[in-house]
Regions:
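Multi-pass membrane catalytic core of lipid/isoprenoid biosynthesis enzymes
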Residues: 1-35, 123-162
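Interhelical loop and helix-boundary elements at the membrane-water interface
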Residues: 1-8, 42-62, 121-138, 192-216
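Intramembrane alpha-helical segments
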Residues: 1-80
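Alpha-helical transmembrane segments of integral membrane proteins
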Residues: 2-6, 10, 29-33, 54-59, ...
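Hydrophobic core of alpha-helical transmembrane segments in multi-pass integral membrane proteins
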Residues: 11-20, 37-38, 67, 144-152, ...
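Helix-coil boundary and interhelical linker segments in multi-pass alpha-helical membrane proteins
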Residues: 16-31, 69-95, 153-171, 225-230
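Extended hydrophobic alpha-helices typical of membrane-associated regions
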Residues: 45, 135, 156-230
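Functional transmembrane core segments of multi-pass inner-membrane proteins
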Residues: 59-111, 116, 134-145
């Protein structure tokens, strides 16, 4: 009963703050986003959690939306000028949004593999139950390769433009490349681990590693901002 009370209070608080922000940016219809989030989380707990992929996609989308809201509320209402740094910042936010979605999606599927025994008891229709551990593991390996190659593409462009064309060997650029390499290294560890995971403990480790990757990725936002401003 106490949990339900707190659930309602926090939902009302979040909705109230969301409506306030929507009116502050003079886009009152943006408040529908927060209504959608509340309804989606309720629907997830009732039905989506046991449905095939729908719950995984929903949680991933809501996680990514939390990052995209920065652009949605701060940049889009004023218009994005393609002739200055605003458009570049918008593209960076889109990259972070995509990163949050794919890592959360991977983690949600791994959690389903970890909880497979319990999900079978409640007749859940998860990817792991429908296709088995072996096929699901191959799907996850493929999904991990998406951010790995995405980061590799960014590293290539950063190295070519900053170090070989502009000959800009600044500490800021070096730290940026090294930090991104750390994220890629963690993704490769996840890739190797998932390629041979079979036990519940393996899936627990991989799920926890996804959390670490997400945290390291999010921490890069204030770090890169500080490096650019100083």
């Amino acid at each position: 009963r106490n949990a339900i009370t707190w659930y309602i209070l926090f939902n009302l608080l979040g909705l109230g703050l969301g409506i306030y922000i929507a009116y502050a940016v003079k886009k009152p219809y943006f408040s529908l986003i927060f209504i959608y989030c509340i309804f989606s989380l309720w629907a997830y707990s009732k039905r989506m959690k046991t449905s095939f992929l729908l719950g995984n996609v929903q949680v991933s989308f809501l996680t990514a939306l939390a990052i995209f809201n920065v652009a949605l509320f701060d940049m889009i209402p004023n218009g994005i000028n393609k002739t200055n740094n605003e458009f570049m910042i918008f593209k960076i936010i889109l990259c972070y949004t995509a990163f949050a979605f794919i890592i959360t999606f991977i983690r949600e599927i791994i959690k389903d593999m970890e909880d497979m025994e319990g999900d079978q008891k409640i007749n859940a229709n998860t990817l792991a139950i429908k296709y088995g551990i072996e096929k699901t593991r191959k799907i996850i390996v493929f999904l991990i390769l998406i951010p790995v190659f995405g980061i590799a593409y960014f590293q290539y462009n950063a190295l070519i433009s900053n170090f070989f064309v502009e000959l800009n060997y600044s500490m800021e650029n070096l730290i940026t490349v090294l930090y991104i390499s750390l994220i890629q290294f963690l993704l490769i560890i996840l890739l190797v681990k998932m390629n041979k995971s079979n036990k519940k403990s393996d899936f627990y480790f991989s799920s926890s590693l996804c959390k670490v990757i997400m945290i390291v990725g999010i921490l890069s936002i204030p770090l890169f901002t500080y490096l650019q401003l100083n």
